[in-house]
Amino acid sequence: VVQSPTSKMISRLVDGQICAYALTPESWGLLSPLAVFRPSSEDRVVEHAVFADGKRAVYTTLNAAVCVTDTGDEVWRYAFEPQSDQVHGHRPGCVLSADEKVVWVYRPDAMAGRDRPDQWIALDASIGELLGQQDLETVGHSGQHLTHPSDGHVLLDVGEGQDGTVIYRALLTAGGISLDRYPWDDRCLIDLAPDGGRFLTVGHDQADAAIHAYPGGEVLLELPVEAFLPIEDVTDETPEFYLEWAGGFLTPDSVVVVLTGETEDDPEWSRSYRVDLRTGEIEARFDGHNEHPYDLQPLGDASWLTTDPAGHPIRWSQP
């Protein structure tokens, strides 16, 4: 699979296989996989990523990070020792660095019962060798990675359940991993702007969304949930509603945020809105064609993804 310089690869897990799709200027509607990666038969994939050339994929299981080729060969395997016998409560995550030389892996070792702190590791993407490691001050269930497009840093949001979330920023240097922790335990990282200059968070209590400057984290715009009143087609004067930990940057200057609520007449409803970051204005409802609040993935280029019933992505844009 040879991709143009303007393409971007994404992956979805469909029927136990990792499917790779190219986001090109010509790829719209229901996307067909350009490559399909078959994990080892004994592996249950947790998270995954694909290389831009469509020749290799990496994935995590509960006990390993693995790299495979599109022909089914295993390139390398990095085991998480000791092996965990805990089936639930921990989901190791992975992401490729922007230059695809490093695989970043979040290990929720505390919840896995390994009797050690959580850790964040960096592996050589070619051979699986450990390049850097940092213990984290978390007892997390899972972690979301976001790769900065140009400065080499990676962001990690560690979810600790009812205890909140912690956001880290890391850079792999000659001396190992340089780690910074943002000064919050109540902000959930949602998305990073296409140019890497801003990021979006939603409060762990789901009462507000905020746009922050990158890298410092200064709040540039705050959107309390009350700012969305009155809500279209909801007649209840005091509806119970909250912001979902969903949405993202639709363009460099606009984000999509998602509300969910309940009324007496409608047990549960969901609405998406586009927010203009240049003015702070909440614009009209955004129709994302998504089945539920978390089936909406803005791509930052005025397009977004949803999922078809079989698990393949559908790419949309506004007319």
Pin down the residues of each PLM region:
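Hydrophobic beta-strand positions that form the internal "hydrophobic ladder"
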Residues: 10, 57, 103, 153-155, ...
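Surface-exposed loop/turn elements that mediate protein-protein interactions on large endomembrane-trafficking
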Residues: 15-42, 65-87, 113-137, 161-184, ...
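A generic, well-ordered mixed alpha/beta core segment in the N-terminal half of proteins
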Residues: 67, 76-79, 91-95, 100-104
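Short consensus segments that form the blades of beta-propeller domains
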Residues: 56-57, 110-114, 262-266
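Short loop/turn segments that connect beta-strands within the blades of beta-propeller domains
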Residues: 6, 13-16, 24, 53, ...
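Long, positively charged binding patches that form subdomain-scale interaction surfaces
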Residues: 195-202, 207-216
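Repeated scaffold domains used in trafficking and secretory/extracellular systems
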Residues: 1-8, 36-55, 82-98, 135-150, ...
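Recurrent small/Gly-Pro-centered beta-turn motifs in extracellular repeat architectures
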Residues: 59-61, 105-109, 156-159, 203, ...
